[in-house]
Amino acid sequence: DEGVEFNIEGNPFSKPYNEFLGFCELVQMILPEQITLVPDTINQITSDHGWSRGSHDEDLKKIIQLLKEKSKNSKISLFIDDINGVKYAAEINADLIEIHTGKFSNSINNGDISILNEVQEIIDSALNHNLLINAGHDLNLTNLHYLVEMGNINEVSIGHAIIIDSLHYGFEETILKYLNIIRN
């Protein structure tokens, strides 16, 4: 469908295991429009942090180059925690970032909107580095509008909250509530 983008998210260092082909092999076979790289471990249920500099830097840069060569139409996204992650994403040739919004979400949910300045700095830095911006983690009906109002967010990832909200409002009404926030 037009306007629908297929994104595969995972750890690029994940090797084949049982029926799993390995992350890089999977994305090269499927060729999604977007590939989001997260530093999760194999047994991790959900992301709890983004990438930062480390001993994996050169290997990660090589994997990004390989993925760009093998899947020419795929954009490569790097899951990051903070402003330091923006420069890192640019240096290793990612096309976009996904801001880990766990800290943002927790702050907003606790009534502390001072976090908005930090998120705005990340957005501004990403724009200065010509990176597109996605965001996700713990976003919900209460905190999403703050992020949307900042502008320049290309895409948001909302997971668990949709299911929880669906128990209260029903699935269709929940989706309409999220779309209303995003569109307004």
Model-derived features: where do they sit?
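Glycine-rich phosphate-binding active-site loops on the catalytic face of alpha/beta enzymes
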Residues: 35-43, 96-108, 151-171
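Histidine/lysine/aspartate-rich catalytic loop segments that bind and position anionic ligands
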Residues: 42-43, 54, 73-125
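Hydrophobic faces of well-ordered beta-strands that scaffold small-molecule active sites
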Residues: 4-10, 33-37, 74-78, 97-99, ...
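Active-site-proximal loop/turn and secondary-structure-junction residues that shape catalytic pockets
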Residues: 10-14, 31, 39-43, 80-84, ...
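Surface-exposed amphipathic alpha-helices with a cationic face
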Residues: 1, 61-71, 90, 120-130, ...
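Glycine/small-residue-rich loop that forms an oxyanion/phosphate-binding "nest" at active or ligand-binding sites
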Residues: 1-54
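C-terminal helical cap(s) of enzyme catalytic domains, especially alpha/beta-barrels
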Residues: 47-49, 111-112, 164-184
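Catalytic cores of alpha/beta
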Residues: 15-29, 82-92, 135, 139-153
